[in-house]
Amino acid sequence: VFQKGAFRSGYYRDQTFMMAINELTLKQLFSGLYANTDINEEPMSAGRQMGAHFSTVSLNEDGSWKDLINQRNSSSDVSCTGSQMPRLLGLAQASKLYRKLKTKNKNKFSVNGNEVAWGTIGNASTSEGVFFEVLNAAGVHQVPMVISIWDDDYGISVENKDQTIKQSISEALSGFQRNSKKDGFEILTVNGWDYPNLINTYQKANDISREKHIPIIVHVKELTQPIGHSTSGSHERYKSKERLDWEKKNDCNLKMREWILDNKIAIQSELEVIENDSKEIVKNAKKDAWQTYLNPIINSRKNLIPILNDLSEEFNKYNLD
């Protein structure tokens, strides 16, 4: 549903999104982690930003515009949570204007304003003021944007009950829901482990927003974390045993596996081969990215050592002891 010409405005959890639209490879992901300064190896920021800060290139090397309607686009991520929201609104507003106004030279930028702006945000960041400001403006202007709210019931260690009224952002925003008399948002909810309904939900979201320029909220619930918020954290410290047991049973990857088996799309042995091969692919990408990062350093060191040796010999000629 993320079609050519569309724009993403997300945050630093969207590596799967970027790989799905073929704008990120595993090697590039690890090159970002290693802060490789070679723009060809780390095209997102040449090592200047924290890992998983994504973008796509909008300009050719000569400074002219690329044909944006024939590529999948992403605005450049920044680290402040919630900061993707104003950019999301602006990108959606651009499509609105392209449909409304008869502008010149729009061939590379829009096809009748059909381009949807796709946003992503974590449930905890929906407590920020900028989130509500943007939703209000998007509802007033009726712009084509789809905002996905990834909800794992926690904001790092803080539960929804301690930060979100009604413990549900979609329920809290229910007054934004459009009806037959007044414009507003279309609010959709779906569980993150429910693959068929995810497909149906996002297809519906895209069709409504693209054709009618109606903003959409997709509240994706019951997401799980395989580990804590970061590799240095431990969710065992703030989640109950009951919650952790529930997450093990409802892990999205596990649920996807069950769905594949239940629908006889593949058998157990085939999935095991895929899983094992996938692990090897990731390991090899990691090694390749690390070696590519090290090679220029190793070569520079090799070139420097003879120079230092020559300097040492030259210095010793003067016998300055």
Q: Residues of each region from the PLM?
A:
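Conserved thiamine diphosphate
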Residues: 99, 109-115, 166-204, 248-277
